[in-house]
Amino acid sequence: MTNLRKTHPLMKIVNSSFIDLPAPSNISSWWNFGSLLGICLIIQILTGLFLAMHYTSDTMTAFSSVTHICRDVNYGWLIRYLHANGASMFFICLFLHVGRGLYYGSYMYLETWNIGVLLLFAVMATAFMGYVLPWGQMSFWGATVITNLLSAIPYIGSDLVEWIWGGFSVDKATLTRFFAFHFILPFIIAALAGVHLLFLHETGSNNPSGLSSDADKIPFHPYYTIKDILGVLLLILVLTSLVLFSPDLLGDPDNYTPANPLNTPPHIKPEWYFLFAYAILRSIPNKLGGVLALVLSILVLAVVPFLHTSKQRSMMFRPFSQCLFWVLVADLLTLTWIGGQPVEHPFIIIGQLASILYFLLILVIMPITSLLENNLLTW
């Protein structure tokens, strides 16, 4: 008798995706982050659902409702901090996942990569709107500053901003619509992640060597299911440690002050995972130029596959490209640090240099280095 998992219409989809899927035998722990992102998304949707049961999206009561969740709801504090720090874990996994793709040349699977870039934008939009919901000082001023950037768009800018606000400032209408979008977007992200997997399974996974692994495949279950479970346990260990020992480590103290349109905080800054993009935005004195640089800092990932000049897919056997990759990582860490600093000397010039280096590395230096490495192969 044929196994039910191979014949049942629903089970065979699961079977071909997670059980009998042929996977390369040599994929390292860097390939764990896809499943970790899936777990993060599930955690965020579940904790978010329970938070939404007690939250009110009204400017008068939003801040109080979050306080009520933390004080009066059974384990409300736990749900709230799991959700807030779950977002940080989500972005850590995202950045490592994208970094893995850049290092090992996974971007050569164009459809998978482009949907990944789209997913990155969707997750960033969701996180931004979620940060506005507690209606603290940084929520309000962060929303005001970032939405105001759209006014830099020629001709339609100011109308567009008022349309998004639903009035002449960030107010009740803005909060209500942000809550609605913040609730629906994770489900769109889940659907996109399904398409991401669909395209990935058309080609099969890449592997550290960047070479074809058709000659050496192993079944996903039990080898990679057990490996993924280890990754999930480590993720949960880090997340629970963060939530139970220092839940406010990655947050901003200003967000414990209720939103006040008449009082601007001394340093307006987003959550840590947006600081690199915020630093690039601030590095350009022109408003429109800054907005373009902000968008391009992520959109540049979509161009990477077309700038692949190497004869080899992965960086595993390319020492010069490896060095440049780690310079890029250091540059992004520098930008993250600068994004959290006040706009004064020497931080301004450091931010500008780091921003220029970021784009130069991806668009110019790395492709040229790959060409030089090609010549070294024939030398």
UniProtKB/Swiss-Prot annotation:
GO BP annotations, alphabetical order: mitochondrial electron transport, ubiquinol to cytochrome c
Highest rank taxon of the organism: Eukaryota
Additional free-text comment from the UniProt record: Heme 1 (or BL or b562) is low-potential and absorbs at about 562 nm, and heme 2 (or BH or b566) is high-potential and absorbs at about 566 nm.
Subunit structure: The cytochrome bc1 complex contains 11 subunits: 3 respiratory subunits (MT-CYB, CYC1 and UQCRFS1), 2 core proteins (UQCRC1 and UQCRC2) and 6 low-molecular weight proteins (UQCRH/QCR6, UQCRB/QCR7, UQCRQ/QCR8, UQCR10/QCR9, UQCR11/QCR10 and a cleavage product of UQCRFS1). This cytochrome bc1 complex then forms a dimer.
The protein's name: Cytochrome b
UniProtKB keywords: Electron transport, Heme, Iron, Membrane, Metal-binding, Mitochondrion, Mitochondrion inner membrane, Respiratory chain, Transmembrane, Transmembrane helix, Transport, Ubiquinone
Keyword Signal: no
Cofactor annotation comment: Binds 2 heme b groups non-covalently.
Cofactors required: heme b
Transmembrane parts of this sequence: 33-53, 77-98, 113-133, 178-198, 226-246, 288-308, 320-340, 347-367
Function: Component of the ubiquinol-cytochrome c reductase complex (complex III or cytochrome b-c1 complex) that is part of the mitochondrial respiratory chain. The b-c1 complex mediates electron transfer from ubiquinol to cytochrome c. Contributes to the generation of a proton gradient across the mitochondrial membrane that is then used for ATP synthesis.
Protein location: Mitochondrion inner membrane
Family, as annotated: Belongs to the cytochrome b family.
Entry binding sites for heme b b562: 83, 182
GO cellular component: mitochondrial inner membrane; respiratory chain complex III
Xref: InterPro entries: Cyt_b/b6_C, Cyt_b/b6_C_sf, Cyt_b/b6_N, Cytb/b6-like_sf, Cytochrome_b, Cytochrome_b_C_euk/bac, Cytochrome_b_N_euk/bac, Di-haem_cyt_TM
Annotated organism of origin: Sorex roboratus (Flat-skulled shrew)
SUPFAM superfamilies according to UniProt: a domain/subunit of cytochrome bc1 complex (Ubiquinol-cytochrome c reductase), Transmembrane di-heme cytochromes
Entry keyword annotation includes Repressor: no
Residues reported in the UniProt entry to bind a ubiquinone: 201
